[in-house]
Amino acid sequence: VTQYEMHAIEDLGLLKMDFLGLRNLTTIEQTLKLITEIHGTPIEIEKISLDDPKVFALFQRGETTGLFQFESGGMKRYLKELKPTEFEDLIAMVALYRPGPMELIPSYIRRKHGMERVEYLHPKLAPILQKTYGIGVYQEQMMQITRELAGFSFAEADTMRRAIGKKIKSLLDEQRDRLVSGMIAN
């Protein structure tokens, strides 16, 4: 157990692992047991619908107190503006609601509602970014962009993902040159 930042731990040759939401998982497990005890009907969590309109109505009203990743005031405000209608909307909000990508949330919301035009800098980006309204939200999208537009191998794309995700400046600088030359060549 440590309070040190990830890079400091890695520089020492140690592995840092974040265990998030374990208390929530325990709460879910206990809730399922209580439902079975009280009602005599076991609930299979993997069979719970991911597209229940009543659940989306709660998200659309920002009634998410106690829901991991969705309970902050800022997130509730954005959910009310977004009016999520599918599971993908919720996944995107969790991915965007962090320093840096957060500035893209208003544009994401406007694009979802047709209030801002979705444009792609290159035709090859359309199938990659279509589900997220032309905004790169996920690491997997960034990897696919490097493969499609710059000719990166899967290993090279993963190196780029790691450089971006861990903010390793020296590796980013190294990858940028490869990315630009690959895009020019393609």
What are these regions (language model features)?
Residues V1-N186:
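Mg2+-dependent phosphoryl-transfer active-site scaffold
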